[in-house]
Regions:
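Phosphate-binding P-loop
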Residues: 52-59
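P-loop (Walker A) phosphate-binding loop of NTP-binding proteins
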Residues: 67
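Hydrophobic anchor at the beta1->P-loop junction of P-loop NTPases
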Residues: 64
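NTP-dependent small-molecule kinase module
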Residues: 2-52, 214-220, 224, 228-281
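ATP-binding Walker
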Residues: 70
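Walker A/P-loop
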Residues: 73
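ATP-dependent small-molecule kinase phosphotransfer cores
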Residues: 90-160, 171-176, 180-220, 224-225, ...
């Protein structure tokens, strides 16, 4: 059955980004919209922004970001299927970039510390996806760390019909899900029942609790490496453009996935999208 998408909203927060500015310790108040534009013109080409403008379509975009292991990829795929749209992952762009260079993903991740152009190229391709010109389906769901902020940039160029979601859950919940993925269901269930359900001030406190239980020792080390890498990425984007993609002011809908199964989260997401004004008939 063909799905007809009826767009009935133009969110003010998207059409006119809330401020376009965030505080960066080294630079003071930074206009991240201008920061993105300057980076594109420098690394992609002087006409790159004009080319993005000309590629803009009316196709709706659901842009999803969030903490690790919050279920954002699962929900993005489910939404794309539900609305008959395309699923796109920024992580896929990163892997393709590494393959084109003939290097591993880990090697490319290390290059990010010194080569700003890698980030900018991936972000520009993300903006091209948001523009929708090369999209065959009626909408797209784009998942990654920065698509919502790239969506705000595209909104400044005239792109409409964007909704930006952020998925979050506690560090404890993220660690438990990582244990389930890396060490299996048994380790997950032990951790869930015995790791105190409280707000942890830092990763080391959580690591200590897990090490006491003697479950998934190597897995939790990998989890902490991933968490530290995420912090590095946030600092890098702050320095490059002037925004922190963990700043919730850049989103329209915040989803808390703590202690929730994917089906429950999906139902909540659909309700939030409906309340926001997104509807498919």
């Amino acid at each position: 059955m063909e799905i007809l998408l009826q767009v009935i909203w133009t969110p003010p927060s998207v059409a006119k980004p809330k401020t376009g500015k965030y505080y960066h310790s080294a630079l003071g108040v930074v206009d991240y919209i201008s920061g993105i534009e300057a980076a594109f013109r420098k690394y992609i080409g002087e006409n790159s922004v004009d080319e993005l403008k000309s590629a803009i379509t009316k196709k709706p975009m659901i842009l999803i970001a969030g903490d690790q292991l919050t279920g954002k990829s699962t929900q993005a795929k489910s939404l794309a299927e539900h609305f008959g749209g395309a699923f796109r992952s920024v992580g896929m762009l990163f892997r393709e970039a590494a393959a084109n260079r003939g290097i591993t993903v880990a090697e490319q991740a290390r290059l990010l510390l010194t080569e700003r152009g890698i980030d900018v190229d991936i972000d520009y391709k993300t903006c091209q996806m948001i523009a929708g010109n090369e999209l065959q389906s009626n909408l797209a769901v784009i998942e990654g760390r920065q698509p919502a902020y790239m969506g705000s940039f595209m909104a400044s160029l005239g792109k409409k019909h964007i909704v930006r979601l952020y998925f979050q859950c506690s560090i404890r919940e993220q660690a438990l899900r990582f244990l389930r993925r890396e060490s299996g269901e048994a380790a997950y269930q032990v951790g869930k029942s015995q790791i105190p359900n409280k707000k942890y001030g830092n990763l080391e406190d959580l690591r200590t609790e897990i090490q006491i239980l003697d479950i998934g020792g190597e897995a939790i080390d990998k989890f902490m490496e991933n968490q530290n890498r995420d912090e590095d990425d946030r600092h890098r984007y702050s320095g490059l453009y002037g925004f922190d993609y963990g700043n919730l002011d850049g989103y329209d809908i915040i989803m808390d996935t703590n202690n929730k199964e994917p089906v429950e989260v999906f139902e909540e997401v659909l309700k939030e999208l409906e309340s926001f004004g997104f509807r498919a008939d």
